[in-house]
Amino acid sequence: SSDLSACFILSVDDSMESILNWYREEGFIFKGGSGAGLNISRIRSSKELLSSGGTASGPVSFMRGADASAGTIKSGGATRRAAKMVVLDIDHPDIEEFIETKAREEDKIRALRDAGFDMDLGGRDIVSVQYQNANNSVRVSDAFMTAVEQGQPFGLTSRTEPGKVLDTVDAKELFGKIAQAAWECADPGLQYDDTINAWHTTPNSGRINASNPCSEYMSLDNSSCNLASLNLLKFLDEDDHFDVGRFTKAVELVITAMDISICFADFPTEAICETTRNFRQLGIGYANLGALLMALGLGYDSDGGRALAAAITSLMTGVSYRRSAELAAIVGPYAGYAENTEPHQAVMIKHRDANRQVHPLHDNDTTVLTAAKAEWDKVVKLGRTNGFRNAQASVLAPTGTIGFMMDCDTTGIEPDFSLVKFKKMVGGGSMQIVNQTVPRALKNLGYTPEQAEKIIAYISDNGSVVGAPVLDEAHYEVFDCAMGTRFIAPMGHVRMMAAV
């Protein structure tokens, strides 16, 4: 047996023993090439006293030790970089320090680089900069977001005396600091606590406090998830119709195999082993969505693109839970199901109802959505009879590493980065390659091979479709990418995340 999970959620309490155990557990997880996330909000703030009478260090200071440990293990011969997620609740008294931590370190990097130090990624001097080995996220509540909208004050509360307000801040100003820091250094991210827990299948066993490093897996503390992703482009048939039957069979097979794998897996701690065996969380997902949409002649930031993405995601999750209910009929539901029967079934009904809000626009999404509707009806019906084998079934991972092994043009739910890429050659130099999805897209949009050849030659020379001969301007949106002359607007990315 071996450790088959790549994603873990840990926990840490307000004690030195727990904090040092956090370092230890992360160390062993990183050594195995996996990643972990946790919420550090239970640790008392730097504005509170210790039992001995001194002032506490606060959670941000303890992040420094964990960050250094991750950086050391990463450089000690591990096969991949340590992956960390650190989460802090919006009402923690040290939240402002947490928000600005990485942005301040970025300022140091620029200053040291200008002074002549080697601050490039992997440079000899970059190791002296702190907080470079983790993703940081702020857990925001509905109450905080309402305060932001209404320009109201927001209370930061004690960890040692729950409910006691230690400081009051301007919610809109604090949100502005989050946005500014994210603009400067891409951190912190946001995790919407109330929404996350509203879709939680096992709330009677504990709330969701944190995520794995990439944020796709959100579940109980001290839990794990094994991931598997499907290459969506491989499910287009010869006529470029999405093959619902093959996709359904693939999801059934992978979910079954993933559930079996839990029985044979090792885990880094006893607590994680117990939680995973009791709740059997799985994480099937997909990659190459951006390439799929382009190949079909659908803009990433278009209603048609979002409709198909939503339909495929719904079908995948519906098939996953339906197979989970079928497995439960044979080998029994997960051990924690009895305690969470009502909330788990309620979340399945929410999924079914949400699926009904998706409106198809083309043949492909109509076919997929019809299948998804049938699957969700089965999920609700079978779940009432059999229960479920797994507390969770699907996630949408970024597939940043495995996507390339799977021959994907795009990773996770991302659009294509650019229409033209440069491939480094073994003997030196580079070769320019036009995105391989472009010819397929032009064919589906009705262009002849001769017209397509002219358009591709133009893209190769100019890196953009703008002004390409014979290309209808109405089709420009199909070729919009993350970068370039016609880059996808920020809300285009947000709308796609909302759709899936």
Question: Where are these predicted regions, by residue range?
Answer:
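Helical catalytic core of nucleic-acid polymerases
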Residues: V251-A287, A291-S324, G428-E473
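Composition- and surface-driven signal marking solvent-exposed, interaction-prone regions
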Residues: T101-K102, D193-I196, P203-R207, D303-A309, ...
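General structural signal for alpha-helix termini and helix-helix connectors
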Residues: S75, L233-L236, F267, A295-G299, ...
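Short, electropositive, low-hydrophobicity segments enriched in small/polar residues
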Residues: S41, F62, L190, L232, ...
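Catalytic alpha/beta core of large soluble enzyme barrels
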Residues: E216, M258, I262-C263, A329, ...
